[in-house]
Amino acid sequence: MTENNIDRISNIIRTQDILRRHDFNFKKKFGQNFLTDHNILTKITQTAELSKEVNVIEIGPGIGSLTQYLLEEAAEVMAFEIDKSLIPILEETMAPYDNFTLVSADILKVDLLSEIQKFKNPNLPIKVVANLPYYITTPILMHLIESKIPFSEFVVMMQKEVADRIAASPKTKAYGSLSIAVQYYMEASVAFIVPRTVFIPAPNVDSAILKMVRREAPLVEVEDEEWFFKTMHSSFVHRRKTLMNNLQAAFGKESKPEIEKLLAQAEISPTIRGEALSIEEFAKLADALLPLKK
């Protein structure tokens, strides 16, 4: 299938026609906003740097606007769609492609490891490329990142504010537990901004394409990974409070003397705030506080 004879569905007239014919109604609970801009879709595909030696997982394909572009560049695309009313639409729009697999399921509830074995060549690198539902962006991302599946790269659209938080540096307003949780595993950067005007229906905020590349090993080495995340999350519960106040709230007031002693030994100020600590400093903090683990 060449560029000249591809029946593009990524324009507002074709999209509206497809939705009208199938009597489709947008469902707010699924956060549905369909892209209708050829240039943006091309840019997303280019950012993903696909080839016929790469498989793709897509979440929330909608009517398949982005899916078309992915299928032309990747070996295979496996798309997960939770909205049953979109299944007949996708079966129609993706009919010309033999490298497309549609899974009618919630990405958070499927056995993803079993599903990816259904790729014709499951040993190829797998990238996640998707316009993620805004209402559940973070749970989906963390579910995929923390899974045992070695996704090599993510190129995903989300609210600009969330993308900024994930890619944020220490001592910035956007920096927080989400920044560290993702950057521990992935190198994250905002690739480009997507205006709200290129969707139907238009969302209330602008979006961003976030590119995340999996690190060969976590960014920092810690003695206890679960404890590292618990300590880190505890430090951000109340952003305006000091590290000591947050840690006391997490581990109990009676633990204050021991926390003070452990922080002093690690040369970490109890009056600093969580957003001022780098991921390396959080690793040092977590290891220092390990004696508090019950």
From Swiss-Prot:
Q: Which SMART domains match?
A: rADc
Which protein is depicted?
Ribosomal RNA small subunit methyltransferase A
* Coiled-coil spans in chain: none
Q: Which GO terms describe its molecular function?
A: 16S rRNA (adenine(1518)-N(6)/adenine(1519)-N(6))-dimethyltransferase activity; RNA binding
GO cellular component terms attached to this protein's record: cytosol
The UniProt entry, under HAMAP family, shows: 16SrRNA_methyltr_A
Gene for this protein? rsmA
Residues that bind S-adenosyl-L-methionine, according to the entry?
N33, L35, G60, E81, D106, N131
Q: Where in the cell is it found?
A: Cytoplasm
Catalysed reaction, written as an equation: adenosine(1518)/adenosine(1519) in 16S rRNA + 4 S-adenosyl-L-methionine = N(6)-dimethyladenosine(1518)/N(6)-dimethyladenosine(1519) in 16S rRNA + 4 S-adenosyl-L-homocysteine + 4 H(+)
* Cited InterPro entries: KsgA/Erm (IPR001737), rRNA_Ade_diMease-like_C (IPR023165), rRNA_Ade_Mease_Trfase_CS (IPR020596), rRNA_Ade_methylase_Trfase_N (IPR020598), rRNA_adenine_dimethylase (IPR011530), SAM-dependent_MTases_sf (IPR029063)
Q: What does this protein's UniProt record list under function?
A: Specifically dimethylates two adjacent adenosines (A1518 and A1519) in the loop of a conserved hairpin near the 3'-end of 16S rRNA in the 30S particle. May play a critical role in biogenesis of 30S subunits.
Broad class of enzyme this protein falls into: transferase
